[in-house]
Amino acid sequence: MNQSYGRLVSRAAIAATAMASLLLLIKIFAWWYTGSVSILAALVDSLVDIGASLTNLLVVRYSLQPADDNHSFGHGKAESLAALAQSMFISGSALFLFLTGIQHLVSPTPMTDPGVGVIVTIVALICTIILVSFQRWVVRRTQSQAVRADMLHYQSDVMMNGAILLALGLSWYGWHRADALFALGIGIYILYSALRMGYEAVQSLLDRALPDEERQEIIDIVTSWPGVSGAHDLRTRQSGPTRFIQIHLEMEDSLPLVQAHMVADQVEQAILRRFPGSDVIIHQDPCSVVPREGKRSMLS
């Protein structure tokens, strides 16, 4: 799984960096030719895209390194750091768009040739949609937080390019302030995406539990297993591609230690079949000690 995960995530990061570089060159020409502030906004966003995608590529490769003596749980948290860094990059570009949009709203400047801007924006829109589709496929296969953050970023680019097309069309008919207004709107959307991305990254760094549906699946597997009378103290988190799962099994006091160990091993394998690549720790408790320790069984 880890090899497949690493291959897909690396390809997604390389594809994003290459696409952002191509779009940057196209947008530099379009902005130089038309003077459109909306295209300037898209150009700045492409610069941010390159920085974010390069950061993603480097961090993802680092996060795929196996655990070592100093990092017993691996390097998966680097993905969350990459997502957090992306949110900062994007927030900076949003601030630039606000300032530029306000300046051109106060002093609108007619564009030289909106038609060229329309053609360039359509090309950028098609390229970005192709990239987002590939990233979405990778996210479905890997659940990579870094690729998901990159995908959200490029999804905002799709919205941006659509807004730019509309702004260029309106400017063509003489409404020159439309360009600046759409730049402000794009900036608001980008800032919202950045804040949401940053929140998710921070939650991961703070070891947020797995989603409720996944935790319920774990509980269902454990509590339905023969020889298990109950369970408690389920603790979960995720670091990169690896889920960390800890749970206490409740077993009859009379169950021999060897048999209790076999049951725990079977439960562990069942969890791993459902969540491959997970790090699972199971502790066995006699039923009689659970009330004394103040634990509440998941079956009660």
UniProtKB/Swiss-Prot annotation:
Catalytic activity of the protein: Zn(2+)(in) + H(+)(out) = Zn(2+)(out) + H(+)(in); Cd(2+)(in) + H(+)(out) = Cd(2+)(out) + H(+)(in); Fe(2+)(in) + H(+)(out) = Fe(2+)(out) + H(+)(in)
Presence of keyword rRNA processing: no
Record-given protein name: Cation-efflux pump FieF
Localization in the cell: Cell inner membrane
Protein source organism: Escherichia coli O1:K1 / APEC
Family recorded in the similarity comment: Belongs to the cation diffusion facilitator (CDF) transporter (TC 2.A.4) family. FieF subfamily.
Keywords: Cell inner membrane, Cell membrane, Ion transport, Iron, Iron transport, Membrane, Metal-binding, Transmembrane, Transmembrane helix, Transport, Zinc, Zinc transport
Gene Ontology cellular-component terms listed: plasma membrane
Origin superkingdom: Bacteria
Residues spanning the membrane: 12-32, 39-59, 82-102, 114-134, 156-176, 178-198
Topology with respect to the bilayer: Multi-pass membrane protein
Subunit structure of this chain's protein: Homodimer.
InterPro entries: Cation_efflux, Cation_efflux_CTD, Cation_efflux_CTD_sf, Cation_efflux_FieF, Cation_efflux_TMD_sf, CDF_Transporter
Physiological role: Divalent metal cation transporter which exports Zn(2+), Cd(2+) and possibly Fe(2+). May be involved in zinc and iron detoxification by efflux.
GO molecular function annotation: cadmium ion transmembrane transporter activity; ferrous iron transmembrane transporter activity; metal ion binding; zinc efflux antiporter activity
